[in-house]
Amino acid sequence: MREHLRVSDADFEVVRRAWAAASSADVDGMVAELHPEVVAIPFGAALEGKAYRGPEHVVRWLRDEILVSWEFFQVLPERFERVGEQLLVTGRWKARGIESGVELDIRASWVVAVRDGKVVYWQTYTDHGQARREIGLDG
């Protein structure tokens, strides 16, 4: 069953706060929204077959791969759908390389799960159809 989330939906707010914190390099703010058993699979990690398990590894990814490479990095959720116990989030991420100055503006989708009021899982997709299939919807 799919339903569009209302702005007041608690799970939506958790995701919004986590990504706002990451987008502003607020590491402590992001950690506050992560479940102790979080599994994060950002786009680059998915390409390498990696996952970051636990808040400390997500923080290491943020500090060692994002904050050192990008002058700014923004995750901008635009639409949320609940599919069972998970969320399908669509939006974009924007970034500018520190050394290269290259700017990115990429459409993205995320499959997200929230448990106990914290993000416990997320995977980033640049192929919306693949994200839909992953969450059990038609591509």
Residue ranges of model-derived segments:
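Short, low-complexity N-terminal intrinsically disordered segments enriched in polar/charged residues
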Residues: M1-P36, R133-G139
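Short hydrophobic/aromatic segments of transmembrane alpha-helices and their interfaces
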Residues: F12, A40-I41, E103
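A solvent-exposed, acidic/Ser-Thr-rich amphipathic alpha-helical stretch
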Residues: V27-G29, H35-E85
